[in-house]
């Protein structure tokens, strides 16, 4: 990216950033019905490699990590059209390119943003309990959920003089609770 002012290149804001992310995954699942119960368990393994490099500064990072993500669902049929379901899933949300790019960008001369090539992914454990009702032309799903996330990415701002410098950081946990009601009709 070239940034100019009065047809002059601003060297501090000209960047050649290389970002390479590779993910290899293997997934297996098993499901079974027994009476009014049905269930499914799954396991996904992922190997992630992220390389970043900012030309001219030599700044970059190399991250390699192996993760295992279990899932499980248990259904119970109350009647032919009513079910309850409990589920668990572990998830990952990797930082995106713009969060990891280590160069500065700005909207004005008082607010400078910098990426963080050392960001880690966010991991979430998701628990759900649902009631489902099916009919000929649709269904309704009422769900209560709890999601616990670690290494949550937040922007951290430091003020030096009259200039604000913002940078994303892995900063703490997040606990989300909620209720969803979804109706689908044809």
Model region roles, listed by residue range:
Residues 17, 55-65, 116-120, 170-172:
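Outer-membrane beta-barrel proteins
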Residues 21-58, 65-71, 80-126, 146-169:
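Surface-exposed extracellular loop regions of Gram-negative outer-membrane beta-barrel proteins
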Residues 27-29, 71-73, 118, 128-130, ...:
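Outer-membrane beta-barrel architecture
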């Amino acid at each position: 990216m070239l940034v100019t002012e009065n047809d002059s290149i601003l060297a501090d804001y000209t960047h050649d950033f290389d970002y390479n992310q590779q993910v290899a995954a293997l997934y297996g699942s098993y499901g079974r019905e027994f009476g009014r119960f049905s269930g499914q368990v799954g396991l996904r393994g992922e190997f992630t490699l992220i390389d970043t490099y900012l030309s001219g500064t030599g700044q970059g990072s190399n991250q390699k990590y192996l993760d295992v993500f279990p899932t499980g669902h248990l259904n119970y049929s109350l009647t032919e059209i009513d079910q309850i379901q409990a589920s668990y899933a572990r998830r990952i949300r990797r930082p995106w390119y713009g969060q990891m790019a280590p160069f500065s960008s700005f909207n004005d001369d008082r607010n400078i943003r910098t990426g963080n090539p050392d960001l880690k992914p966010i991991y979430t454990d998701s628990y759900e309990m649902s009631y489902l009702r099916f009919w000929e032309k649709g269904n309704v799903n009422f769900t209560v959920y709890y999601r616990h996330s670690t290494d949550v990415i937040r922007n951290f701002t430091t003020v030096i003089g009259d200039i604000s410098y913002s940078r994303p950081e892995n900063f703490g946990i997040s606990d989300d609770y909620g209720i969803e009601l979804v109706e689908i009709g044809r």
